[in-house]
């Protein structure tokens, strides 16, 4: 009897995960989830273009004041299917897939501090190497941190072929409040664990950061329907908003 042991095509799996995310903004959701898992109370996300030999490069910067990462944490961050959150019910990430969307870029730079050590990790040309059937490696430098204050800062260069149309301020803000942990409705249910978490956002078309507080923003309930029709006529239904609360088991 012969035995077949299934194998995994590592490079192909990295390619499938990194490039099969349908929405480029999914990178933002994954970054926010990681920040919550790191117990961060403050996040900063910004988009800008920089010039490299006459070429405009999209630069995404993601920062938080969470617990930071050590070598084990960095290994998990770059690995496929290796999640340090899998056995923690309070954590969001559990599959070890999400951050691989970062690999759809030219370069990833991570600077993080944990337990008095500063780690600087660089992955060059992940997209090109994966398409050449090569798993990209990460170079890590370790040094003493100037402060024991932990944090993580990630810079992603050349993401999504430098296409910038999705990263306008209003578009990113809307995505954050509808599709990420920052837009959770838990406060509506009397859960205030994350009420002090804030995010500072600067879209590709902005020069200043906007402070976004935790929790989905619901519109005010509208005035009486009859008054809406008096004001907006046939467009009145577009302006109708009513909050319903149902109790049950």
Where on the chain are the PLM-derived regions?
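Bergerat-fold GHKL ATPase/HATPase_c domain
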Residues: 1-55, 72-78
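Short beta-strand element(s) in the Bergerat
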Residues: 55-60, 152
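GHKL/Bergerat-fold ATPase module in large chromosome/replication-associated machines
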Residues: 192-249
């Amino acid at each position: 009897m012969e035995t077949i042991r299934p194998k995994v095509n590592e490079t192909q799996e990295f390619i499938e995960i990194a490039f099969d995310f349908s929405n480029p903004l999914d990178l933002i959701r994954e970054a926010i989830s990681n920040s919550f898992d790191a117990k961060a109370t403050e996040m900063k996300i910004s988009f800008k273009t920089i010039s490299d030999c006459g070429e405009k490069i999209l630069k995404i910067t993601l920062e938080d004041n969470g617990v930071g990462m050590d070598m084990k944490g960095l290994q998990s961050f770059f690995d496929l299917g290796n999640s340090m959150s899998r056995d923690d019910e309070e954590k969001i990430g559990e599959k070890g897939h999400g951050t691989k969307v970062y690999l759809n870029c030219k370069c990833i730079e991570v600077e993080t501090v944990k337990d008095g050590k500063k780690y600087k990790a660089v992955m060059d040309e992940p997209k090109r190497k994966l398409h050449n059937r090569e798993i990209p490696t990460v170079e890590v430098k370790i040094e003493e941190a100037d402060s024991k204050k932990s944090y993580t800062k990630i810079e992603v260069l050349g993401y999504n072929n430098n296409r910038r149309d999705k990263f306008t301020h209003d578009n990113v803000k809307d995505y954050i409040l509808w599709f990420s942990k920052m837009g959770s409705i838990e406060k509506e249910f009397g859960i205030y664990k994350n009420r002090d978490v804030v995010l500072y956002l600067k879209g590709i078309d902005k020069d200043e950061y906007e402070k976004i507080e935790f929790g989905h923003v619901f519109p005010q309930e509208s005035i009486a329907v009859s008054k809406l029709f008096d004001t907006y006529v046939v467009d009145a239904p577009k302006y109708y908003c009513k909050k319903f609360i149902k109790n049950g088991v």
